[in-house]
């Protein structure tokens, strides 16, 4: 399944506009906020451009976790039973690029990351959490747009083995 990801070009424009406005009003604070924002799960990226660059360099698909890290019970359970386990971390390092797309209620997320996450949520039609999509990205540099080659999606699974087996089936298709 291939999705044309035209909203990313809007996101990239919005990102540069937000950075410019924030930099003008807050000095370098905008860059500091962005630099200090990290994923809830160690080792996960939060920026689609960084995930794309690493995916392109390694040839690995991106595995995006749409989560509500501070309020979603099933998201917390998935983190505890799968993402926090050494077995998963070892598997992920060999097989995927990890991208966390968080929709917290009590944690402050920079505006550019909020916009990125909302655009990706719309592009993948995510309506519940946790939702994990596995995909490849291609970028048209001239148009500054991504094309998504979706490999599959999953939600909560109780064990590392069950989770990784499911994702491996998506990757092999």
Q: Model-predicted segments: where are they?
A:
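The canonical Cys-X-X-Cys-His
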Residues: 72-76, 132
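Non-catalytic, surface beta->alpha helical segment in thiol-disulfide oxidoreductase systems
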Residues: 122-173
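C-terminal segment of classical bacterial N-terminal signal peptides
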Residues: 12-20
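Short active-site neighborhood of thiol/selenol oxidoreductases, capturing the structured segment around
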Residues: 58-72
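Thiol-based oxidoreductase modules, predominantly thioredoxin-like and allied folds used
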Residues: 42-45, 88-115
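N-terminal "domain-start" segment that seeds a small globular fold
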Residues: 24-52
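Typically the conserved alpha-helix immediately C-terminal to a functionally engaged Cys/Sec
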Residues: 75-91
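A short beta-strand-turn-helix
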Residues: 44-62, 92
């Amino acid at each position: 399944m291939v999705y044309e990801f035209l909203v990313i070009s809007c996101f990239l424009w919005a990102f540069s506009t937000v950075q410019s406005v924030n930099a003008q009003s807050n000095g370098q604070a905008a860059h500091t906020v962005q630099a200090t924002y990290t994923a809830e799960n160690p080792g996960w990226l939060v920026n689609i451009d960084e995930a794309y660059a690493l995916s392109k360099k390694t040839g690995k698909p991106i595995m995006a976790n749409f989560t509500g890290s501070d309020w979603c019970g099933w998201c917390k359970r998935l983190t505890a039973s799968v993402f926090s386990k050494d077995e998963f971390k070892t598997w992920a390092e060999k097989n995927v690029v990890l991208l966390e797309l968080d929709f917290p209620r009590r944690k402050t997320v920079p505006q550019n990351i909020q916009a990125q996450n909302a655009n990706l949520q719309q592009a993948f039609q995510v309506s519940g959490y946790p939702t994990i999509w596995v995909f490849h990205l291609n970028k048209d540099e001239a148009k500054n747009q991504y094309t998504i080659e979706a490999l599959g999606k999953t939600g909560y699974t109780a064990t590392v083995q069950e989770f990784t087996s499911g994702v491996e089936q998506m990757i092999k298709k």
